[in-house]
Amino acid sequence: SEANIDAIPFQHELLDQWRFNFKGVQFEDKKRGFLWFGAIDDVWIHNQSKKLIIADYKATSKKTEVNLDADWQIAYKRQMEFYQWLMRSNGFEVDDEGWFVYCNGKVFDNHFNGSLSFDIKMIPYKGNDAWIEPSLERLIKCLNAIVIPDANENCNYCKYINKINLATDF
């Protein structure tokens, strides 16, 4: 391929489970008393280093070329890093570089004819899962707190919930 990835699909007896929503790659975190999981799309193994490569598939349909530059796509990057962390937590050696296989539907060709074509772009991403452990600690602390924390003014989800509460407050 034009991405020149020196890897082949990884074969593992749990691969189908790893891809299944609500099952996925699981890590029993005995230190915190939690089961963390995430459903991956694909895993490759590098032919030289033998490190695993996480591949995540994305699909969209837009006129512009796909990339990972939008602010909201930090969620995609965090998702990739979490998958890398899960696999490492299960004892696998995982490459920091993962791949997004981004499919962009060509609906702007002015013809449909019962089929849809895609442009496929391979986007490398060098993950860094250093944020995960401290985030899990904060998450556990929040869950165990007696007092609910104040909404974060920079959190779009918090803003959304506040608007719902205002709209339904009688």
Predicted regions span which residues?
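A non-catalytic, helix-rich entry segment at domain boundaries
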Residues: 1-23
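Short, structured coil/loop segments at alpha-helix boundaries
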Residues: 4-8, 73, 82, 152-155
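Generic detector of short alpha-helix boundary/capping microenvironments
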Residues: 12, 30-31, 71, 143-146
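Mg2+/Mn2+-dependent nuclease catalytic core
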Residues: 20-134
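Polybasic (Lys/Arg-rich)
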Residues: 121-159
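Short functional micro-motifs and their immediate structural scaffolds
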Residues: 163
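Short cysteine/histidine-rich zinc-coordinating motifs and their immediately flanking basic loops
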Residues: 166-170
